Amino acid sequence: MKRTAIALAGFAMFGVGVAQAADAAKGEEIYKQVCFACHDAGVAGAPKLGDKAAWKDRIAKGEATLDKHAIEGFTGEAGSMPPKGGRTDLSDEAVKDAVAYMLSTVK
């Protein structure tokens, strides 16, 4: 029991095996570098930053789905999203941070 508690404390301390929450503040920087190119102008059906109506149906699908579509890419009725906004060098976490930032502008 004592070893388990120590191991769990170590994992929590170093973030090993623990899902990290997306960071909207970090995501703002990614947005300004990458995402703005489509999401400021609504290119290819991209919902514009801060447009609650455009994001409503997407938000209803859940943040996990939005993260998946942003990371893997998506084509649907409302438009298309290239994987990682065309920047495949971005980490999945950076993309999730950018999604969190965009969602923070419409909640």
Range-by-range predicted roles:
Residues 47-48, 68-95, 102-105:
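Axial heme c-ligation environment in periplasmic c-type cytochrome domains
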Residues 35-41, 98, 102:
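The canonical Cys-X-X-Cys-His
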Residues 25-33, 44:
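Local sequence-structure signature of Cys/Sec-based thiol-disulfide redox active-site neighborhoods
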Residues 40-68:
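Gly/Gly-Pro-rich "capping" loops immediately C-terminal to redox-active cysteine motifs
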Residues 30, 58, 62, 87-90, ...:
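Extracytoplasmic/periplasmic, Sec-exported soluble proteins
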Residues 5, 14-23:
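Sec/Tat signal peptide C-region and signal peptidase I cleavage site
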Residues 1-7:
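Bacterial N-terminal signal peptides that target proteins for export
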